[in-house]
Curated annotation (Swiss-Prot):
Swiss-Prot/TrEMBL TPR repeat ranges: 96-129, 177-210, 219-252, 258-291, 297-330, 333-366
Disulfide bonds: none
GN (gene name): rapE
The species this protein was found in: Bacillus subtilis (strain 168)
Ranges in a coiled coil: 24-95
A GO molecular function held by the record: phosphoprotein phosphatase activity
Lineage, highest ranks first: Bacteria, Bacillati, Bacillota, Bacilli, Bacillales
Induction comment from the UniProt entry of this chain: Transcription is under the control of the ComA-ComP two-component system.
UniProt protein name: Response regulator aspartate phosphatase E
Length: 375
């Protein structure tokens, strides 16, 4: 049997990583299988095996993003357990990858402050990383988690760093589109929707070129435009874009379906289109149950309280309490604002004040998140 050097396998793992970064699932899967065959006949090298396990972990994160399933989530945990046993042996590069990929794992699980903790540890190793694309990937991931934590200016800083690298590399179109999403989302959080729109329109233009091979990003481009118009109170345009997003998300049975149905139901309720709202409401609850999405089960329950049962304050407060966690605070902020405005419109001033106080509480918890990771 012909032996192969660990250096040769290491080069293949680097190439595998490039396919993962580009979301080239088929090429990544083929190269992974080839590397696993090579490892069977490779000279013994424990460091290389750790590198392989790290990249296999990153590969699973990619699959869980593009093809969400309980099986992929379970395998992620298995890879993590294997890598944990080798932590003391990690050199600078592998320590960087370990903390970076672990941050991605925590982010996918909605543990945003834990994700930031690992990302900051990885950032200390960034000076040892010479590859520009690797740096762009890292900056993008930081921009993403800070966006979810509503740390807007920090997110914008990292998104700009990432985009300025990716725009010089034609092959990384998915990441360029995603940078536009994050930048636009930050502008929306700053209530500067007019600046968000050009980024979202540019993202849709790029996503249209990828629609045959990346339905998810194409759907998300419509969805984000719909959300922006929703924030601008242009409900007709918002509904049209989210309807188009739903068509695409249904094709791939995306785990974003509960959110898309929820947002469209909310828009229809605001427009007084009760029949369409109830249709989205029912479909959304079914999809939330199918995906075991507890967050959106709670948010659909809130829609029921606010728009179907015409306000049940104790029940709404109970839902608020379920959203008091790192992942839930941004949704709690928006829900409390929605409830406050609705109660105010209906003349329920005391209930409105309760909601607005809860909104301020959520904002404070989000701002505290910046200090919750280790320095």
């Amino acid at each position: 049997m012909i032996s192969i050097t660990s250096a040769e396998v290491g080069m293949k793992i680097n190439e595998w990583h490039r396919h993962i970064q580009k979301f080239n699932v088929t090429d990544a899967e083929m190269l992974k299988a080839e590397i696993e065959r090579d490892i069977e006949v490779m000279e013994e090298d424990q460091d290389l095996l750790i590198y392989y396990q790290l990249m296999a972990f990153r590969h699973k994160i990619m699959l869980e993003y593009t093809l969400p399933s309980d099986e992929n989530r379970m395998e992620l945990s298995e890879y993590l357990n294997k890598i944990e046993g080798h932590k003391k042996k990690l050199d600078n590069m592998r320590a960087y990858y370990y903390n970076f990929f672990r941050g991605m794992y925590e982010f996918r699980n909605g543990e945003y402050t834990r994700a930031i903790t690992y990302y900051k540890k990885a950032e200390r190793k960034i000076p040892t990383i010479s590859d520009k694309i690797e740096k762009a990937e890292f900056y993008f991931k930081l921009s993403e988690v800070y966006y979810h934590m509503k740390m807007t200016h920090i997110s914008m800083h990292y998104a700009e760093l990432s985009y300025n690298i990716y725009k010089k590399h034609e092959l990384y179109s998915v990441r360029r589109i995603q940078c536009h999403f994050v930048i636009a989302g930050n502008y929306d959080d700053l209530e500067n929707h007019e600046k968000a729109l050009p980024h979202l329109q540019e993202a849709l233009k790029g996503a249209e070129l990828l629609k045959s091979k990346n339905t998810h990003i194409y759907a998300t481009a419509f969805f984000n435009l719909g959300n922006c118009y929703h924030k601008m109170d242009n409900l007709n345009k918002a509904a049209r874009y989210i309807e188009q997003a739903l068509v695409q998300y249904r094709k791939i049975n995306s785990d974003v379906l509960p959110q898309a149905y929820h947002d469209l139901a909310l828009i229809y309720f605001k427009q007084g289109k009760k029949e369409q709202a109830m249709d989205c409401f029912r479909k959304g609850i079914r999809s939330a149950v199918d995906f075991k999405d507890e967050l959106f089960m709670n948010l659909f329950e809130a829609l029921d309280v606010l728009y179907i049962r015409n306000g049940d304050t104790p029940k709404l407060l109970n839902i608020f309490s379920r959203l008091e966690n790192g992942k839930g605070y941004p949704y709690l902020e928006e829900l409390a604002l929605l409830g406050g405005n609705l109660f105010d419109y209906n003349g329920k001033i005391e209930d409105s004040i309760i909601c607005f106080k809860k909104m301020v509480y959520a904002q404070k918890q989000i701002s505290k998140g910046e200090c919750m990771y280790e320095i």
